Every structure is written in structure tokens, then in C-alpha cells.
């Protein structure tokens, strides 16, 4: 009897010890993964049918970079790696969907300098993100002067005959005027719509277009069985990354490159998005 009881207690102690060892090992593994993932840029590639895209532009290559957050939480090496891989793909067009710095204007110049290896034949088009609005005009100017980025702030540009890029101010920190942004576009134009915050897609759900966004970091820390964390300004929005349909518009949310709040990513590596556009 005593022996049986003692064996049972010993087994229970062993099981508890094993449980804590496994739990500790899992925690260490997740922490290690969180430290590693911010340094490993994942490339996602898609063929995307764009309504009203001229057939002469079928196969156009577009790279999307978003949320580099140059600052103390995102190593420059990660941003440079994303830029290097984008440049190696030789895109026809690069679109930048905001949050170039964490907060500090002093990071804008170095951030713009890191974009200079990109030389797409149709140029680089950018919008601002909510983190850029402490110094929006100065950050936009740095990106234009140093890297040649054409910044859209409730505006649109025809980058090739019959193909446009429209972009709005940030939905949290900026003053959005989507009517002004879309005013230059013919009703039958093929176009991409740039909105830092994915909620901006609601403003173009009546138009046939592809919308590109960032802001979410894909949740940044994605633990099994735990709902992802949505950043400010997305209350009630049903999607945190990937593709979705909103009326006539299709939306892609990139996980972005950088980090905020924590220098960690878990089950959510940084992303470079490469899109090959197809005439529909």
C-alpha cells in the first residue's frame, strides 16, 4: 500500500516536472522564434487579375513594401534585405504603403537612402502611414528628394497609359478625401488603390480595383489558439492579413517588414509582396 502510494506520488512529481520542462522548452522555443523571425523576410508572390488593366500591361511586375518602421526595433539589415530582394526581382513598379519610421524624423533620411537601390522603370509610388504623421511633410519630402518616391496624398497618378495608382492619407492621423483621390481616374480605368490602414478599402468598394494595405503587421505576435491583435483604427474589421473581397474591390494586406512595440515576431515573419498583374 505504502509502496503503491509512494510510486504514485513519485510518478505525479515526475509528470509535473516533465510538464514544466516541456512548457519551459516551448516558451524558450517561441521566444527564440520571435527573435529569429524579425530577421527573416518571407517573399509572397501572386498573379493578380486587375479589372480594366490594358492587355499591353499584362505581366506588369509590382513590388509592395510596407511598414519598415526604421528605428530602434527594426534592424536596418532587415530593411536592406527586403529592398535587395525586391530589386533583384526587377519590378516595373514599387508601391510603398506607409510607416517608414517608428516615430522619429531623424530616421526618415536613412530610410529613404535604403530605398535607393530600387530603380523600377515606372517609378516608386508611396503613401504615408499613421507613424509618419508627427512630421508628414518632412518625411514625404525626404522620400522624394533622396529616393525619388512620388507621394500620393489624396491623389492619383497615371503610371502607364490606362493604368493608375490612387492613394489616400492615413485614416487615423490624416484627413482622407477619397473623392479627390479618385477624381482624375476615368470610370473604366485599371488601378491600384493604396491605403495604409486596410479599413480604407470601404471607400472604394464601389469600384473594380485592387487595394493594397499594411498597418497590421499581420498581428506580429501570433500564438496558436489566440485571436490576433488588431492595431488601432481597425475596430470590427474582419481581416488582419492576406486577401479579402469588399464589394467590387479586392484587398491585400501585407504583414510588412518592421516591428512596433516589441522587437519580436512570432508565427508572423516580415513580408515582401511581389505581384504580377494580369489583364482580366
State each model region's role.
Residues 59-69, 162-170, 192-196, 250-255:
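Active-site-proximal beta-strand elements of phosphoester/diester hydrolases
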Residues 4-26, 30:
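N-terminal secretory signal peptides and thylakoid transit peptides that target proteins
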Residues 50-63, 149, 157-166, 245-250:
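Beta-strand-turn-beta hairpins that frame and shape the catalytic cleft
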Residues 65-66, 94-98, 124-130, 152, ...:
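Active-site neighborhood of phospho(di)ester-bond hydrolases with catalytic His/Asp-centered motifs
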Residues 60-147:
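Membrane-embedded segments
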Residues 198-273:
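Conserved beta-sheet core of the metallophosphoesterase superfamily
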Residues 141-142, 146-149, 155-156, 160-195, ...:
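Binuclear metal-dependent hydrolase catalytic cores centered on His/Asp/Glu-rich metal-binding motifs
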Residues 12, 31-63, 75-77, 84:
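C-terminal segment of N-terminal export signals and the immediately downstream linker at the start
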Amino acid at each position: 500500500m505504502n509502496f503503491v502510494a509512494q510510486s504514485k506520488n513519485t510518478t505525479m512529481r515526475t509528470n509535473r516536472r516533465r510538464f514544466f520542462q516541456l512548457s519551459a522548452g516551448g516558451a524558450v522555443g517561441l521566444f527564440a522564434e520571435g527573435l529569429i523571425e524579425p530577421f527573416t523576410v518571407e517573399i509572397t508572390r501572386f498573379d493578380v487579375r486587375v479589372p480594366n488593366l490594358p492587355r499591353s500591361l499584362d505581366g506588369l511586375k509590382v513590388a509592395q513594401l510596407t511598414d519598415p518602421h526604421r528605428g530602434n526595433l527594426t534592424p536596418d539589415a532587415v530593411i536592406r534585405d527586403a529592398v535587395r530582394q525586391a530589386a533583384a526581382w526587377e519590378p516595373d513598379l514599387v508601391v510603398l504603403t506607409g510607416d517608414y519610421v517608428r516615430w522619429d524624423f531623424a530616421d526618415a533620411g536613412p530610410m529613404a537612402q535604403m530605398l535607393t537601390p530600387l530603380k523600377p522603370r515606372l517609378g516608386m509610388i508611396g503613401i504615408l502611414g499613421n507613424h509618419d504623421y508627427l512630421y508628414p511633410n518632412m518625411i514625404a519630402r525626404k522620400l522624394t528628394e533622396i529616393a525619388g518616391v512620388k507621394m500620393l496624398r489624396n491623389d492619383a497618378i497615371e503610371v502607364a497609359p490606362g493604368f493608375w495608382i490612387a492613394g489616400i492619407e492615413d485614416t487615423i492621423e490624416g484627413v482622407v478625401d477619397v473623392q479627390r483621390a479618385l477624381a482624375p481616374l476615368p470610370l473604366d480605368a485599371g488601378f491600384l488603390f493604396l491605403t495604409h490602414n486596410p479599413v480604407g478599402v470601404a471607400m472604394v468598394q464601389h469600384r473594380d480595383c485592387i487595394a493594397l494595405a499594411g498597418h497590421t503587421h499581420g498581428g506580429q505576435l501570433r500564438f496558436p489558439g489566440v485571436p490576433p491583435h488588431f492595431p488601432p483604427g481597425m475596430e470590427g474589421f474582419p481581416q488582419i492579413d492576406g486577401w479579402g473581397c469588399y464589394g467590387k474591390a479586392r484587398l491585400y494586406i501585407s504583414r510588412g517588414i518592421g516591428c512596433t512595440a516589441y522587437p519580436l515576431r512570432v508565427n508572423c515573419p516580415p513580408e515582401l509582396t511581389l505581384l504580377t498583374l494580369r489583364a482580366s
